[in-house]
């Protein structure tokens, strides 16, 4: 797992924003929501923004997390989505 200090800095459960940057794709937001649903079922309304040249899309989604391990698992699973370049 990742070596983070979320457990020292946050109280759980908490609403946590994730920003996923990936190749421009009409399905990126759907794939992000699918991962979120698999690890933290909920009603999600992500926002999507295209880069100035249209090469990349960023998807921002707020997910209710329950622990440090939950955040780390989400980061790992979101980063594994095909076409994803960064998870912030």
UniProtKB/Swiss-Prot annotation:
Transmembrane segments: none annotated. It comes from the Bacteria. InterPro entries: UPF0250_YbeD-like, YbeD-like_sf. GO terms for cellular component: cytosol. Gene3D superfamilies: 3.30.70.260. Belongs to the UPF0250 family. PANTHER family: UPF0250 PROTEIN YBED (PTHR38036:SF1). This is UPF0250 protein Spea_3154. It comes from Shewanella pealeana (strain ATCC 700345 / ANG-SQ1).
């Amino acid at each position: 797992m990742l070596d983070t200090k979320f457990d020292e800095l946050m109280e759980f459960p908490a609403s946590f924003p994730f920003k996923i940057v990936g190749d421009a794709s009409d399905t990126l937001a759907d794939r992000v929501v699918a991962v979120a649903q698999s690890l933290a079922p909920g009603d999600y309304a992500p926002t999507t923004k295209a880069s100035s040249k249209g090469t990349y899309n960023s998807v921002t989604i707020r997910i209710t997390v329950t622990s440090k391990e939950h955040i780390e698992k989400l980061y790992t699973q979101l980063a594994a989505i095909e076409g994803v370049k960064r998870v912030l």
